[in-house]
Regions:
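Terminal presequence/propeptide segments associated with secretion/organelle targeting
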Residues: 1-307
Length: 307
């Protein structure tokens, strides 16, 4: 439910909004198109994955299959195991953990998708957060030049305005900068705040950032509006992650018991191992895919089909 109701819809919407802005600016300028082609592709990769995943889960009726599996497991656990073994309440642990984390998970995802990943000016600002003294200015400048080579401030400003609107509308737990700065100084007008940030931040331009490297000071860094914002954002993300920690542990314990119970319930079934962090070998027959009546996807692509 969390994937279909929260995670995928939020990712699809937020990335779709950002990608629409990138696409407009890329179409209007060859320079921006070159700068943002890779960024657009990277963002759209998991955006398309989320769309396809949600569609496939619904079309293949995966939820009903999982519910049937859980009902069979619960019946087996009650008839064949002791309460002390933990199998009887494994599914309850999972459900309680997911429900307990729902609001914090949703808020964290909105902040990560809309601000942490989408607003680029925060990247150079964040890179100086822990710096007390620049010991290798040449290396710092090299890193900053690499960032600004593929950065367009006007595009990022447009993205930031839309993302801030989305965060204000959809995030149930906002960073303190919204109440302490945006509401108090800008009357809640996120567009006006974004203009202030980009007009006054050192990190809005390559020239400003390189000059800052030459004349670095902690006081100048801490007063920068992008640094103020990123510190508030990171503090809220840490707070939301901490709020989910206990339920994440409960989920992990419940899931471990559920999988162990399924293996015990079906001892003759061949269970695939977890493929994460392993070298994977695939073998068998390669065949076309028939997702629905009258629809067939072949396992190869032809030039005629592409054109």
């Amino acid at each position: 439910d969390r994937m279909l109701d929260i995670e995928n819809p939020q990712r699809i919407f937020i990335r779709g909004e950002r990608q629409a802005i990138l696409k407009e600016d890329m179409a209007a300028s060859d320079k921006v198109r070159i700068q943002y082609a890779s960024k657009y592709a990277q963002s759209s990769n998991y955006w398309k994955n989320s769309i396809g995943m949600s569609r496939g889960i619904r079309k293949l009726n995966v939820k009903a299959q999982k519910e049937a599996q859980e009902a069979a497991f619960r019946k087996w656990a009650e008839a064949n195991t002791l309460p002390t073994e933990g199998y009887m309440d494994a599914l309850d642990r999972i459900r309680e953990a997911v429900e307990g984390n729902a609001s914090a998970f949703a808020a964290e995802q909105v902040l990560r998708e809309a601000l942490y990943r989408a607003v680029e000016i925060l990247t150079p600002a964040r890179s100086f957060l822990a710096v007390e003294k620049i010991t290798d200015p040449a290396r710092s400048k090299e890193a900053m030049r690499a960032f600004y080579k593929d950065y367009n401030p006007a595009t990022d400003r447009r993205v930031a305005k839309r993302m801030m609107q989305i965060v204000k509308e959809k995030c149930g737990d906002l960073p303190t900068v919204f109440a302490e700065v945006i509401d108090k100084r800008f009357g809640g007008d996120t567009d006006a705040y974004v203009d202030y940030l980009y007009d006054n931040s050192i990190f809005a331009t390559e020239e400003g950032t390189l000059a800052f490297v030459d004349d670095f000071s902690v006081e100048k860094r801490d007063a920068d509006p992008a640094v103020v914002f990123v510190r508030s954002l990171d503090a809220k993300l840490l707070e939301l992650a901490d709020a989910q920690r206990e339920n994440n542990r409960r989920f992990k314990d419940g899931h471990r018991l559920y999988i162990a119970g399924l293996m015990r319930m079906q001892p003759d079934k061949a269970w695939a191992s977890d493929a994460n962090f392993t070298i994977r070998l695939t073998y068998g027959r390669v065949l076309p895919y028939d997702p629905a009546d009258g629809i067939r996807y072949n396992y190869y692509t032809t030039l005629k089909g592409v054109m």
